[in-house]
């Protein structure tokens, strides 16, 4: 099942301009590297390390200060990575006869404007920390609300007109 899912996800990435990926199926990061296109980490919760507050899995625990808060995010990154790396490695070995380029935990590699992170949380629930880099955007929650008066910006319309419709793979 996991190998088939990796195949489906990788196939869906073919011919795209960029890959927006959920932290669970992190194959999106490696597919983008293989295809030479940008990747965008779309996290439903804060994943970028900060000293301001601990990682989600430690959030209700005793607060130990900035360094400990930062460390909890690195621990969480590794837990997420450990849970998902084997199917990626297996697929890549079968497909390419080698592991992905720079195979390792991808979350901390979204470190530039070319590799941004978007977080779908409210600044009122998880305030944007001062120590997050500029390429991390706390966008607020993503809803499928119908706004009949909304108009897409011209640059977005031009982008969409240049190619096939975007495809989202996730949940």
Protein language model regions, located:
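Nucleotide-sugar-dependent glycosyltransferase catalytic domains
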Residues: 1-166, 171
């Amino acid at each position: 099942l996991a190998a088939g899912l990796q195949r489906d996800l990788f196939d869906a990435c073919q011919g795209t301009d960029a890959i927006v990926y959920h932290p669970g199926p992190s194959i999106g990061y490696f597919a983008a590297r293989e295809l030479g296109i940008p990747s965008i980490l779309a996290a439903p919760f804060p994943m970028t390390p900060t000293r301001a507050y601990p990682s989600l899995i430690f959030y209700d625990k005793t607060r130990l200060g900035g360094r400990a808060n930062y460390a909890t995010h690195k621990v969480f990154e590794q837990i997420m990575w450990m849970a998902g790396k084997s199917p990626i490695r297996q697929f890549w070995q079968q497909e390419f006869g080698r592991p992905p380029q720079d195979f390792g935990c991808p979350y901390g590699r979204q470190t530039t404007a070319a590799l941004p992170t978007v977080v779908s949380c409210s600044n009122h629930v998880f305030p944007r920390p001062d120590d997050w880099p500029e390429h991390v955007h706390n966008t607020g929650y993503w809803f499928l609300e119908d706004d009949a008066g909304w108009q897409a910006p011209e640059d977005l319309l031009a982008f969409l007109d240049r190619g096939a419709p975007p495809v989202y793979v996730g949940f």
